[in-house]
Amino acid sequence: MLVLKTTDQEFSTRFQSLVSDRREATVDVSGTVRDILAHVKAHGDAAVQEYTSRFDHYSPHSHHLSAAFIAEQAAKCSAEVKAAIELAAERISSFHQKQLPQDIGYTDTVGVKLGLNWVALSQVGIYVPGGRASYPSSVLMNALPAKIAGVERIVMTVPMPHGEINPAVLAAAQVAGVTEIYSIGGAQAVGALAYGTETITPVDKIVGPGNAYVAEAKRQVFGTVGIDSIAGPSEILVVADRQNNPEWIAWDLLSQAEHDPSAQSILITDSESFAQQVIGAVEQILTTLPTTKVASSSWQNHGAVIIVRDLAESIPLLNQLAPEHVELCVDNPQLLASQIKCAGSLFLGRYTPEAIGDYLGGPNHVLPTSRSARFASGLSVYDFLKRITYLECNQAALQAIGQSAVTLAETEGLPAHAGSVAVRLQGLNDM
């Protein structure tokens, strides 16, 4: 765990090292993934079955989950879990419903009609991780924006190691209205969604997080299909003053550290004594935390505490780090928030732990990682929509602007472009 002070002579060098820290998988899986994708593309269901048997030790007659099986598994959830899923779905839906954009259409001063129509994607694949990362919240965060956008066909893949699945995942799928679900995972699931098999019709876009093999598979099928992003390890940056309870902040830092040994948790504070209290609280919690093996590895190898002269000094540092999650645990957090240009999502004030956003705050928890918040945003309704623009010229409009189009086409050395306009202008002149 790294402790930095902005007053230290070597701060700039050490901070830049932190900024450039690459926490993605160091093992190159591209060759293995390329082989899996090629095999799935060539052999379809047989290849999917082969890899599922090898990696998940599961060989069902069909990977398609029946409505009866989904209902049976979902019914295993307690009433409390079902109610929590329904509340989360309600809040996520409400926030994303407000994102729906309006079409644009107008006629300009020369009579040209111009416009832009928003059109939903036809079919989308949602990858839901299995094993340790089998999260019902991921189902809601990926499926509900697609449903609200108007996607007609939503396909979900989720691995079932040894034939087992978290019932809450299927309960979330029920609530989100996802009915086409296949018990496959890994690069083979991405290949099946992208290329199709005898039983799985290919989709237009694939969204959802996964391990290094899933991430690489999404990278390789991009172009054949669209993808949301290449997800890296989780990140949280907490800006906190000494008025906070250090134990609260320690729990916040560990909330991301427990995701992955490569996750990163950073505290920025203007109080050295408070920083030490938080470090002590983290170490104390780790002695009893059930996920301590993962969280300890993350905290020791990638955690950081940065002590600044004042909290205003945190802003340029934060914008360079461009973290996935940012907590502003201060009074009047909007003052700092208004200066933040590079972050996946903000959690404002002392009573908004990032975990609220993970589950049921409303905004999406699928967020840019690995400093991609410099240029990317979290998943939203817009990820499931396309924009189609249109133009319509009447005779007068074409006569008003056509000759300039001819001039530009001739300047670019494209005579057929020029001719397609010129013949119409000539025809109008001959009328």
From Swiss-Prot:
The keyword Cytoplasm does not apply. GO terms for molecular function: histidinol dehydrogenase activity; NAD binding; zinc ion binding. Keywords: Amino-acid biosynthesis, Histidine biosynthesis, Metal-binding, NAD, Oxidoreductase, Zinc. It comes from the Bacteria. Its EC number is 1.1.1.23. Its cofactor is Zn(2+). One of its GO terms (cellular component) is cytosol. Binds 1 zinc ion per subunit. Transmembrane segments: none annotated. Zn(2+) binds at residues 256, 259, 358, 417. Catalyzes the sequential NAD-dependent oxidations of L-histidinol to L-histidinaldehyde and then to L-histidine. This is Histidinol dehydrogenase 1. The gene is hisD1.
